[in-house]
Amino acid sequence: MKKTTLLAPVAAIALALTSLTGSFTSASAASTACTPSTLKTVTAKTLTIATGAPAYSPWVIDDKPESGKGFEAAVAYAVAKKLGYTNAQVKWIRTTFDSAIAPGPKKFDFNIQQYSITADRAKVVDFSSAYYKSNQAIVTYKGSKLDGVKSIADVKAANATIGAAVSSTSLDAVQNQLGVKPQVFNDNAAAVTALKNKQIDGLVVDLPTAFYLSAAEVPNGIIAGQFANVDKADKGAGLLLAKNSPITACVTKALDAVRSSGELATITSKWLTASAGAPVLK
């Protein structure tokens, strides 16, 4: 990713990270013996971590989580280190998004794949505390009706067609924050195709996805702007574990230590600093 100067948005991210301590877990408080020799992992003395197939930037760079490059890959290794695992003791596997969140036993110790923490999901899986809560952003292309907007009022005045995926926080944001009627798609892939074909003027997604789409997917793609995620029901993204996992409390304790030490903010700055380059729409 391009290096950018850390501006106010990054400071805001760091501040927000300090509040991401709530979690939906069913395990007891973490004991002091959260070590590779005592943790009841899928494979003894090995931490098996799952991600998507494929995994995309900026979450994982070049679809190689074992490199530790990318926001989620770096977070995973930071948690592993806090638990006492070396990189050699970390094993990566791949899962689909839906299969990992379904009820039942898991072949991984935790899965990191932008899983939003919700009460409904917590009925069938465990979550750690949150490691990230993203702003929303509008992806468009040069010369579109949304190119050059400076405010939410400008977005409304542009009379543009804005898309979002069904049942997403992005769709809620289009309706409730931008105050425009969205064009709804079955998934982000369909919406991206429509944007590429200029069937819509813009697409609302989370900020990291917006940077990837504008840089790698949408011809002449740009980010029209970002706006805060004000959905109080959005608890952020957490590490996903099997329901009643014996290591949920230890994983949460490790993630909380990564956050409180400032390391999570550093990782966020390294891999998501491009947020400083997207104008804030108010």
Segments from the language model and where they lie:
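C-terminal region of N-terminal signal peptides and the immediate post-cleavage residues
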Residues: 6-7, 18-37
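Ligand-binding clefts/hinges and TM-proximal coupling segments of bilobed small-molecule sensing domains
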Residues: 29-37, 89, 169-179, 253-282
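Extracytoplasmic small-molecule ligand-binding "clamshell" domains
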Residues: 33-111
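Bilobed "Venus flytrap"/periplasmic-binding protein-like clamshell domains
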Residues: 49, 68-82, 116, 135-188, ...
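Periplasmic-binding protein-like
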Residues: 53, 133-137, 208, 215-253, ...
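Acidic, polar ligand-binding/catalytic clefts
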Residues: 89-154
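Short helix-initiation/N-cap motifs at beta->coil->alpha
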Residues: 90-102, 183-197
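A ligand-binding cleft/hinge motif common to bilobed small-molecule-binding domains
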Residues: 99, 115-123, 173-175, 201-233
